[in-house]
């Protein structure tokens, strides 16, 4: 065998004596070797990890930069991403309508606003419309400071907002007056106009203003946990109340629980601000402990009197509204697909009462009280969103709206307003905003604004919905997007994306990059709704978790087999992609069925399934994967854990490209580090490369600048093209009609 271009791989020390003993229900004590455990030490704390990272970065960069199509892809992506896009508008308490906006290649979306009375003016303006209110692009020189969330005060005078840097889950909360917007001429790296309030030590933005607008509640950790660059799990989450104008050190502790350091405590307020719902989460399951209080009669400074409404790990509660002593919830209490319920806090002994019963065939994903007495419910039904309007007083259905649209929706509205904005998008629909009047008898809204993508004729594309049988015969739904004239004869390259976990549904989502991939490579983009998601309700999720996790891999592999059998693909032209939990999927499938795939892309993947609970948020994922330290769970986890089941012998692995970040504080990069080291050791002279692209300036996924995403996508697509021998149609006019897979 000739020596491949990537031989030899960068050296890394391998400790053959490193091992951990686990307890197995089937086999008793089991000693598991872990020769790359040294790579668990974070980048900043280990010279060995640092040397490994720098060597892998250089190695991968050299290979990727030598791909001829890489620069062409980068330029093509830049040109295609340069279009105006915006989010669903939201009317706020200051009399303005706010929306996020990007003129094309800005690093982050900016926040703009227009007076409610002047909303329609943005439809006739050639630019973004309205005025700039806040621009995260002005907060940093490299574009990696991102807005993680915001909340307007009830009085409309103050705006609390969270800022994260370099994709970290850690963020800082600031406050500014709504009368003090950003100026377009502002110097980058500065944030003038904000108030002196600075709230640190928070992971994620969970902020609720008190009804008097004098301060807000928030969740935080002790100062020593504000690292953001290590693997240590955050501990001792607490709830505080901050008063405007005071230092954080003077904030009032609302709740702490030192006996349970890994529980996550958060506080929600009812829309009126009168009732507070305090919840504890111990894992990623949809179960919580819940307490409630009437803070309108409580003294925050001297302690809130809490009433326990649920003391078992059985359900989750989301407060959606209140009327006098009646509180409205969305909950999965005795309803795995969720329902809407009420609680009279003056007669709490009567318990929770059902207002809108559970739909056994659809998952309730959001509930809002709008237009005084309308209950707007969004369901996930058969891998698509549905919007239903009910009467708040009786719970009875009024009508389904936008039933002619297939895809996903996002909504905004207020209880004191008859208007609701609805944003619809899909695989070939970049985004259309409708204004819907809830006090009118109609099931359709009026067009408000639509995203346009110049240079890409969206009518040239089509999306099919098909079902195929999994290994156990279960029917699995799948979306297939392609150009209408792409032949279904097995010659087109196929790119399959999967996730399969945490009840996260894979819905029709617009991506100009994906459509470009389909156009330039005459390819098909495929999304199977495998078990572990929630496309068909909570039962679908449960069929792909814990001891049933293998169903997820079987569903995904079965998708590829069906595509080949039905002439959508052939065995030489299938690439797959997955990130985070989807990284378990891609690496497990590459281990179990390497012959099915030509190229594998894994982004920020969870891969060492015996060690995941020890780092970052991993302990919370045991509800999804199981606990490796539980003998019964160990047996089914160890059986598929990608890091521990790398094939050997004469197996030919697909080409593999791993994306990770040295400071990812959601999924530690150690998963990718260890797995890539093991793959390169096991297959030093394989015909296909195993590369790892490591970023030193980003986190998990959120907050990446546009430039970062463009560069990553150019690396990804050009790597797939080289690995599968694809021809860019933009460079070869005949390739669009005569594309064929070149086996190299």
Swiss-Prot record:
Lentinulin A displays strong and selective activity against the plant-pathogenic nematode Meloidogyne incognita but shows no further phytotoxic, antibacterial, or antifungal activities. It catalyses: Hydrolysis of Pro-|-Xaa >> Ala-|-Xaa in oligopeptides. The keyword Protease applies. Pathway: Mycotoxin biosynthesis. The active site is at residues 580, 664, 700. One of its GO terms (cellular component) is cytosol. It comes from the Eukaryota. It is an enzyme of class 3 (hydrolase). One of its GO terms (molecular function) is oligopeptidase activity. Coiled coil: none annotated. Its EC number is 3.4.21.26. It holds the Pfam family Peptidase_S9. Prolyl oligopeptidase; part of the gene cluster that mediates the biosynthesis of lentinulin A, a highly methylated cyclic dodecapeptide with nematodicidal activity. Excises and catalyzes the macrocyclization of the methylated core peptide of ledMA to yield lentinulin A. LedP works in a two-step fashion with an initial cleavage at the N-terminus, followed by a second cleavage at the C-terminus of the core peptide. Belongs to the peptidase S9A family. This is Prolyl oligopeptidase ledP. It comes from Lentinula edodes (Shiitake mushroom).
């Amino acid at each position: 065998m000739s020596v491949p271009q990537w031989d030899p791989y960068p050296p890394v020390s391998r400790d053959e004596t490193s091992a951990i003993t686990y307890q197995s229900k089937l086999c008793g004590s089991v000693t598991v070797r872990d020769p790359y455990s040294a790579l668990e030490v974070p980048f900043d704390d280990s010279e060995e990890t640092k040397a490994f990272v720098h060597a892998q970065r250089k190695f991968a960069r050299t290979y990727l930069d030598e791909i001829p199509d890489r620069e062409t892809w980068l330029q093509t992506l830049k040109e295609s991403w340069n279009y105006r896009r915006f989010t669903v508008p939201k009317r706020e308490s200051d009399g303005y309508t706010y929306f996020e906006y990007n003129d094309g290649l800005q690093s982050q979306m900016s926040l703009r606003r227009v007076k409610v009375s002047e909303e329609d003016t943005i439809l006739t303006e050639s630019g973004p419309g309205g005025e700039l209110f806040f621009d995260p692009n002005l907060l940093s020189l490299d574009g990696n400071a991102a807005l993680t969330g915001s909340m307007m005060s009830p009085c409309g005078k103050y705006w609390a907002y969270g800022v994260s840097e370099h994709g970290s889950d850690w963020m800082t909360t600031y406050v500014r007056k709504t009368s003090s917007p950003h100026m377009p001429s502002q110097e980058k790296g500065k944030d003038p106009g904000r108030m002196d309030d600075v709230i640190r030590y928070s992971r994620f933005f969970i902020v609720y203003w008190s009804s008097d607008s004098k301060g807000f509640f928030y969740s935080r950790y002790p100062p020593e946990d504000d690292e953001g660059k290590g693997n240590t799990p955050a501990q001792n989450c607490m709830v505080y109340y901050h008063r405007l104008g005071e230092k954080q050190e003077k904030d009032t502790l609302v709740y702490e629980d030192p006996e349970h350091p890994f529980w996550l405590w958060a506080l929600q307020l009812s829309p009126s601000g009168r009732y507070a719902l305090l919840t504890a989460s111990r894992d990623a399951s949809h179960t919580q402990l819940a307490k409630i209080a009437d803070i309108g009669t409580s003294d925050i400074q001297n302690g809130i009197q809490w009433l326990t409404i649920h003391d078992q790990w059985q359900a989750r509660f989301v407060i959606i509204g209140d009327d006098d002593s009646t509180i409205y919830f969305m909950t999965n209490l005795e309803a795995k697909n969720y329902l809407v319920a009420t609680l009279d806090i003056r007669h709490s002994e009567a318990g929770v009462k059902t207002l809108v019963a559970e739909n056994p065939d659809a998952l309730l994903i959001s509930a809002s009280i709008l237009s005084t007495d309308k209950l707007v419910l969004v369901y996930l039904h058969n891998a698509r969103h549905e919007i239903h309007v009910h009467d708040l007083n009786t719970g009875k259905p009024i009508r389904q709206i936008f039933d002619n649209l297939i895809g996903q929706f996002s909504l905004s509205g207020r209880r004191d307003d008859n208007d609701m904005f609805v944003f619809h998008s899909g695989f070939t629909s970049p985004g259309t905003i409708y204004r819907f009047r809830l006090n009118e008898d109609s099931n359709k809204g009026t067009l408000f604004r639509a995203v346009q993508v110049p240079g890409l004729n969206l009518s040239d594309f089509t999306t099919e919905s098909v079902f195929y049988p999994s290994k156990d015969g279960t029917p699995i739904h799948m979306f297939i997007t392609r150009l209408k004239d792409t032949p279904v004869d097995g010659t087109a390259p196929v790119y399959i994306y999967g996730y399969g976990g945490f009840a996260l549904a894979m819905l029709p989502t617009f991506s100009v990059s994906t459509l470009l991939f389909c156009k330039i490579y005459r390819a098909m983009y495929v999304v199977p709704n495998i078990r572990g998601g929630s496309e068909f309700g909570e039962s679908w999720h449960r069929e792909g978790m814990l001891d049933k996790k293998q169903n997820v891999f079987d569903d995904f592999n079965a998708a590829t087999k069906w595509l080949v059998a039905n002439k959508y693909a052939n065995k030489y032209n299938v690439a797959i992609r997955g990130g985070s939990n989807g990284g378990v999927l891609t690496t497990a499938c590459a281990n179990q069925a390497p012959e099915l795939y030509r190229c594998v892309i894994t982004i920020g993947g969870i891969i060492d399934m015996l060690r995941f609970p020890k780092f970052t948020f991993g302990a919370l994922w045991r509800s999804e994967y199981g606990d490796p330290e539980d003998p019964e769970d160990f047996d089914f986890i160890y059986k598929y854990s990608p890091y521990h089941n790398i094939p050997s012998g004469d197996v030919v692995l697909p080409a593999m490209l791993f994306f990770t970040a040295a400071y990812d504080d959601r999924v530690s990069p150690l998963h990718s580090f260890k797995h890539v080291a093991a793959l390169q050791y096991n297959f030093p002279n394989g015909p296909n490369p195993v590369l790892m692209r490591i970023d030193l300036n980003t986190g998990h996924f959120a907050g990446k600048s546009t430039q970062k995403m463009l560069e990553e996508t150019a690396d990804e697509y050009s790597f797939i093209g080289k690995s599968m021998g694809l021809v860019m149609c933009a460079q070869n006019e005949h390739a669009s009609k005569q594309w064929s897979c070149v086996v190299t």
